[in-house]
């Protein structure tokens, strides 16, 4: 059956072509395209256990989307594996490692999934059929909501639990609507797992919302004031956006950890996300080490695209930060304006009370009422300023940081390849020396090592090409998402401004006759 | 550095919208609505020049009164000369029964100058467009303050010219006509100290005098009313100021947001760059409207309240003077009784008592009329300004709405 399928037309693998594919916004078309990668191409096979090479049909230009073989794996997983399946465990058991393990050469090659040997071809085909079916159905059909923040517990051990509701018609989920309770550290844990699996091979993993020790402490301590409710709402909205972005990513959506997060009622506590835990400190140290490395690695960039893009992201980052600062100032001033308008309203009411001309007195009271309503308007507008505009910008500032991180991983990957080449050279020199010195057993050892390092060099090259390809695709997808996001949110924001003006018109139109009535 | 010179048409071209100026004109003059054109005596400030430390006003008079040598003439005056004129009214016993038009506040460009200076210092840290934008803004601010101070000086003169008694004042005529410097050097330290003590005594007196309940219901009511009103106007004026300032800050933020969006738009390579540029344009335009809203609120609300703060103080001063004369009258009565009892200097006491009585009655009579006029003026001024405020708010909100809707139509059409 699978063999009869006509592969969707693919171009020569340039990022733009990939974008065309995604035009339909169909999660599964991309999966389908990847499923049809040629088994003969060296890249995918190396990632997976051998049996998966039954990758279908159709000669496919090797460049496109081959890295998504991992996606295939998960596609199968969604069809076949229940939560209790033993096959899932190897993935899950890895949950503790990502948080702690720095990116070492061994983990640079993705597969934690190597231990998972999946995919009989039949399953594979079947899943592809089902996927294609769904592909013809609704576009990208999954909706996530984060709601109902609830304080659990007391004192410093208290935490907020959020309800995560998923509505979907995707068949990979067992139900079409379900919800679970999650706490903030669960979200961080999810991100941590996804990041450790996908970041270093070039996927742009959406960053989780930031921790805030001050904010949370206030909530824990039970301060029931407006600033802590604001904080909780800000966090809830941020968590919702985080999940929505994550599920939008076709590769991440297939990840079993993500599914477990959304579906399973009990989630093992992600303890390694605590800021001051041992793991946390180790993370900080590693980040610092990374930073140092970044400065010292000088890569021979053969592809101008990467340099260009990096520069673009750098510029974007700068401008977004500036814009964000201005919008934050606007939020602040708008709140001030609201407070001052309220104060003026009260004062005008008092003035109206003491005014002894009746008509003028009434008009002043009306003015006070109008100003009070306008104060409300300002408050609502400040809310919109913040939640729509300001948060969009801060989300993207963090996303761009993730993008930059992915570029850095590529550089590290290159470094690893370089290092392997250098080591290989050294081993060859050793062999030559041994030959001259005529030490047969040492020669054998040297030959073994040479073989070992030749393989590593090949692997390094493949990894590098892979990550470069992935990044190109990811950046294309990211740019598309960014354009869509900004357009949608900014239009919504402008509509909020429209509403404010319409309300203002209503209020002043009501007041005008009152003012004219002063006789 | 010489500031902007206001031409005869009061700088019709310099501002974005000429209506801004004419509204302002109407606004402040409308604070005293009965200052309509009176052929007998018309005064205005036709020109003004700002030099580093002082402002020079050109006071232009048109009159058919025989007191003046010509029918139309102009002189140049500075702020101190206005204060001299005002003080001469205060010190004139004959005018004790009138509300003396409050003196115009001193021209204060310090804040604006400081901002312009800071901008100059920070020139390196911003883009050329931003710098030009901010410079334009600050210059507009400077201009607005300038126009306001001109208007306030003008209103003072108009009030005097409209007052049936004050307009005949000799000092006033000298002020209008004498084309040399009046040499009224500002008060020196000694005089300022004297003033200070005078005011202290007055407020101490005020406490004593206000304790005396007035026989006349009208004045009793006025006193209670004015006391409370004055305080509340003060509060409202301060709060209105803060509100308009916040509004302006928010408008300034729109400016920066527009600039940032512009930068994002020009450096972006995807199709969103047009989007950003359109939104940037929107923010620039909407900012102008928001700044106008803030300026109009300042004019119609804050300035109105500030002016009536000063006028209500002048009215309180009138009441004080009347109370003082009442106290003098009562003291003269007591002195007369004593003199009669002792049968010594009775005639003197009688004359003194009569004078006090006349003075008190004269003040009471004119004060009553003044306070009634004050109320009429006040109600009319509030009405005019509140109506204009509402109309302007509506105009700007509608303008804003249209801008936003047009922009949204374009943006939605594109995507």
UniProtKB/Swiss-Prot annotation, chain A:
A 1,2-diacyl-sn-glycero-3-phospho-(1D-myo-inositol-3-phosphate) binds at residues 183, 185, 211, 235. Its main location: membrane. Residues 278-295 are annotated as: Membrane-binding amphipathic helix. GO terms for biological process: early endosome to Golgi transport; intracellular protein transport; lamellipodium morphogenesis; retrograde transport, endosome to Golgi. It is found in: Early endosome membrane; Cell projection, Lamellipodium. Gene3D superfamilies: Arfaptin homology (AH) domain/BAR domain, Phox-like domain. SMART domains: PX (SM00312). Residues 140-269 form the PX domain. It is a peripheral membrane protein. The keyword Phosphoprotein applies. Residues 1-20, 30-103 are annotated as: Disordered. The keyword Lipoprotein does not apply. The modification Phosphothreonine is found at residues 101, 104. Residues 260-519 are annotated as: Interaction with RhoG. Keywords: Acetylation, Cell projection, Endosome, Lipid-binding, Membrane, Phosphoprotein, Protein transport, Transport. It comes from the Eukaryota. Residues 30-44, 93-103 have a biased composition (Low complexity). One of its GO terms (cellular component) is endosome. The modification N6-acetyllysine is found at residue 469. The modification Phosphoserine is found at residues 97, 117, 119, 185, 277. Involved in several stages of intracellular trafficking. Interacts with membranes containing phosphatidylinositol 3-phosphate (PtdIns(3P)) or phosphatidylinositol 3,5-bisphosphate (PtdIns(3,5)P2). Acts in part as component of the retromer membrane-deforming SNX-BAR subcomplex. The SNX-BAR retromer mediates retrograde transport of cargo proteins from endosomes to the trans-Golgi network (TGN) and is involved in endosome-to-plasma membrane transport for cargo protein recycling. Belongs to the sorting nexin family. The BAR domain is able to sense membrane curvature upon dimerization. Membrane remodeling seems to implicate insertion of a N-terminal amphipathic helix (AH) in the membrane. Predominantly forms heterodimers with BAR domain-containing sorting nexins SNX5, SNX6 and SNX32; can self-associate to form homodimers. The heterodimers are proposed to self-assemble into helical arrays on the membrane to stabilize and expand local membrane curvature underlying endosomal tubule formation. This is Sorting nexin-2.
